[in-house]
Design a protein with these regions (language model features):
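Primarily single-stranded nucleic-acid-binding OB-fold modules
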Residues: 1-196
Length: 196
């Protein structure tokens, strides 16, 4: 179902099925962005007198349980509605048999429209020889602007997402990149979202 919401899955750090594997390599309490549909919401008081919310987040690869309590509860709880597409800013803790997901903030799909944009371009690793890099750089230089740029490099090794912090492009770079055969799209800026 989340595939019906353009940009939602692409903004996430990983799929839900990939999270346990990714978490093995992350420092404790690392922040990630998770996309999915909200299911099975339960709100209840904590022993300390506050409130907590427990919910299931699901995507095309699987589902996991997340919790929100303390200060995060006030921001998260109103956005937890069954069958709602969301992006969850979460701290991930490794634990026996998997991961614990602590929701810090939730953005509904509609709220993501208000987040500043970034441009992401996908590049096949085999095309990143000197000539390919020069071609990509030339396209980007022609369309300088204010949008942050991310390059998703794909190859036999898997994929890597590179944030090119020194490069800013204009929205018109999207059309130029697509015309040159690159897959490019505008997304909510992950860095803005990860800072909460």
């Amino acid at each position: 179902p989340i595939l019906r919401y353009p940009g939602l899955r692409e903004t996430a750090t990983c799929t839900l099925a990939e999270l346990p594997h990714l978490a093995r390599d992350l420092p404790p309490r690392s922040r990630v962005l998770l996309a999915g549909m909200v299911e099975e919401v339960v709100r209840k008081p904590t022993k300390s007198g506050g409130m907590m919310a427990r919910f299931v987040l699901s995507d095309e690869t699987g589902a996991l349980e997340a919790v929100a309590f303390g200060r995060a509860y006030d921001q998260v709880s109103p956005r937890l509605k069954e069958d709602t597409p969301v992006l969850v800013l979460a701290e991930v803790e490794r634990e026996e048999g998997g991961v614990r997901v602590l929701a810090q903030a939730v953005c509904t799909y509609e709220e993501l429209e208000q987040v500043p944009r970034a441009l992401e371009v996908e590049v096949e690793a085999s095309l990143l020889d000197d000539r390919g890099v020069a071609h990509l750089k030339s396209l980007l230089d022609e369309h300088a602007g204010t949008l942050p740029l991310y390059v998703r490099v794909q190859g036999a090794f898997g994929e890597a997402l590179l944030a090119l912090r020194e490069v800013r492009v204009g929205e018109e770079a999207l059309g130029a990149l697509e015309a040159a055969g690159f897959r490019a799209y505008l997304l909510p800026d992950r860095e803005v979202l990860l800072q909460g």
